[in-house]
Amino acid sequence: MTALAARTIVRFRHLVIAGWVTLAVLAVPRAARVADVLSVEVGGVKTESERAYRLVREEFPQPIANFFAITIQGPMPIDSAPFAALLDSLTASLRREPIIARVVSYHDARDASLVSRDRRTTFFIASLGAEASKTATSHAPVVRQAVESAVARLRQARDFEIHVTGAPALDYDVRTVSLADTRRGEQRSVPLAAVVLILAFGALVAALLPLVVGVIAITCSFALVYLAAAFHPMSVFVLNIVSMIGLGVGIDYSLLMVTRFREELNRGLGARDAATRTIATAGRAVVTSGLTVVVGFAALLIIPVPETRSIALGGLLVVAVAVLLSVTLLPAGLAVLGRAIDGPRWLAHLLAWYHHPLFWEPWARWLGFHPLRALAIGGVIAAAITWPLAKLRIGLPSTGWFPSGTDAEQGARALEAIGSRGVIEPIRVVLQAPSGSRIVGSRFVRGLARLSDTIQTDPRVARVRSVVDLEPGTSSLQYAFLYSDPARARARYGDFLSAYLSEDNRTTLMDVVLTDTTSLTDAMDVVRWIRAVANGGVRGLDSVQVSVGGFVASGVDLQDDLLGRFPLLIGLIVVTTAIMLALAYRSVLVPLKAVAMNCLSVAGAFGLIVLVFQHGVGGHLFGLRGPTEAIYVVVPVLVFAVVFGLSMDYGVFLLSRIKEAFDRTGRNDQATMEGLSATASTITSAAAIMIIVFGTFSFARMLVVQLIGFGLAVAVFLDATLIRMVLAPAIMHIAGRWNWWPGVHPEDVPRAGAGRSRQEEPGDSAAGTASSTASAR
């Protein structure tokens, strides 16, 4: 921040405060409605699964592209009068809804797959019309209200357990739970963060300011996400990312600013001058730290997947807002408050021990005398933590993907009683004949039958619903005869063919329903196998275009796309970070060491994620029902991108203080001990806040949010303890004066004890921006 900008902000401090208050008030209504414009699956990528979904929606007269499954469990069989009356009442109620295109129940189709073996559980399908399918998730409350209305009219309905499930219902509940997780995480983390801030500042007023900045940053960012959703599809998980990152960096940056302001007051400056000085020094450090986080989020934009791009956009917005608040609103408020931020005085005296450097000096001194021993101990711990990473398996988690206890999840469990849970998310195989041909022509019908028979040989497949699986025991020759007269076929199987055969008879659909014992992880293997079979050439389907889609296939496409671009993302972040550090410190070893340490903290976080979630060691502490068996692909990509930026803040802080002491004394060992002891309490406070904010989301009901929250919390913990307090200073001791080569030659250093010729302003030291970070703290 320039001196002119600093003076301008302080001069017009009341206007700055009024402007931000106005923006925050205007942001509240949109922030409150942000969940309404977010989606669980944002789509939009030109993948095979997206092509299959588009064909299903566009080619069939009454597509079962989006449907609700209503489950009924009762104390009596479906043939009893009360059960039959309830089923008829529910289906009639939904048929009256304009958004419902068709309803199929056991009473309509007499399909045994719709009823459990004991005949006490059934389900029926309510399919949305083409127009309603465009906003399928938003219609879940309408369907549930129709069900509740029908239940209220029948006294005997109270003896039955009824749930609304299906993909739109699951997506709606995911969005609802995600919003609840965000609110719950904020409610838990803010009070705990307040305790850490009081401990760090020894003052109630000073502790309150960072919390205010964090809350305003989240509110304004939610409003910006609401506006951005009109131009770019936004994932529902943006809620959790904005909340986590907003609170974390907002409070962290404010901690830096308030700490510097109090230091300037203690040096005798007035409130306005102290605020101006804080902006010019700590403000520059905040901007630099913010840029390192932005680099990580910006790198995610190279991945053309709407889910990751929307998360990246949300992260960019909240970091930018947090930085702006920290360098404008916060110093303006500090200039107004002045000495009032230090109250009450007795609290500062009570907590003075926390800030005394002697508390950390014994550790710094021991590490200075035994750097090799510290490096060896730290290396063994790091190896033990990162070892599980070798067993990392990327995929859709087998358990806990959907939040437990919701209406849709309970309905999915009811489907297991029938053996039909796979109906909710079938693998959808769309086959389209060449232009001018009929997919149900005799040549293609035999190929369809071969493909269906091949798919059903896999024990993970429960059944296939298609135009060649209408009735058991029917041969391909009989199907060829049936479809030789399409009008006759539609007259006989009209309802089914309207969903599985296009009007021009060119396109058909196969729904592959998996067994209830098939996990999502194994289902991804089934998708890849079906694609291999179809692309390998099925006799009779040589000229047919095959597209495999559905929820699981979308997960396969997302994973392949992200993993294919992950090396580029890693390279971009690592190279950019290394260049920034090389320019800041004029050193070769420092950026290499910093990048290696950052990679180690990320690897350690991944190792613990694998241990706790994939293998289930201690997973019950986070509410897991069992091992997930795989880690969702978005988690390692996002954790790497975010942690690399966040951890750099602590690295720059520690290295800058060491460099400042080295420039003053010319003694590397003394500089390392001094830098470590001087920064330990601040790093501890800042990291504790981050760990609290991220850690509270480790107990969310959404598994993907748990994974991200746990990964970020663990990474910050490892970075602030094992990395910054043990390994980094140990390596600094061992490298000696070579740390600063070529900016400072090992033989060209100041004499021990030599001071500077003048009081340096931020940016004047060899460390440049990094030096300003040190002075800021």
Enumerate the language-model features and the residues they cover.
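Loop-to-helix "switch" segment enriched in basic
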Residues: 37-38, 400
